[in-house]
């Protein structure tokens, strides 16, 4: 069950009959102004950097699946997370949702066997090589504008 999650879009169970659904999240530290990236260790794009996330199961909502994936991959999901949709990418085989989540400070992720490292890095200073899909996302102008707006210091 999701506790304390705020989202600006619907949280309904998704019809998986047409596409596979995946979701990922950019965790951003307010204190250090850096984003969390994970180094892949498995047979899907090994040695590439990505963000926490993965495939949503057929009986899960988008947010339930994202929360489960984060707990599995980094053993962390903020109790009162405010998730902001950044991008929705659709092709013939899958739909991938990318979210932004501000955390007060960096945390040390407890990695599962899918990942062998992590790094907190500044925007546009991402580690290389990035997962091909994430590379496209972070180099998309609209995404960069959204990230810039979301990471601006609020007075």
Give names to the regions the model predicted.
Residues 50-51:
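A short gly/proline-enriched turn/hairpin at secondary-structure junctions
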Residues 153-155:
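Short acidic DE-rich linear segments
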């Amino acid at each position: 069950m999701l506790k304390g999650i705020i989202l600006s879009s619907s949280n309904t169970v998704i019809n998986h009959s047409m596409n596979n659904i995946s979701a990922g999240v950019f965790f951003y530290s307010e204190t250090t102004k850096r984003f969390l990236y994970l180094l892949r260790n498995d047979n899907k794009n090994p040695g590439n950097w990505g963000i926490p996330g993965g495939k949503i199961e057929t009986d899960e909502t988008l947010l339930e699946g994202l929360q489960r994936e984060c707990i599995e991959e980094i053993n962390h999901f903020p109790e009162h997370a405010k998730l902001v949709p950044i991008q929705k990418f659709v092709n013939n085989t899958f739909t991938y949702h990318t979210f932004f989540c501000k955390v007060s400070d960096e945390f040390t992720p407890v990695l599962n066997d899918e990942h062998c490292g992590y790094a907190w890095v500044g925007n546009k200073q991402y580690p290389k090589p990035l997962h091909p899909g994430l590379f496209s996302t972070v180099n998309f102008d609209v995404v960069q504008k959204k990230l810039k707006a979301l990471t601006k210091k609020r007075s």
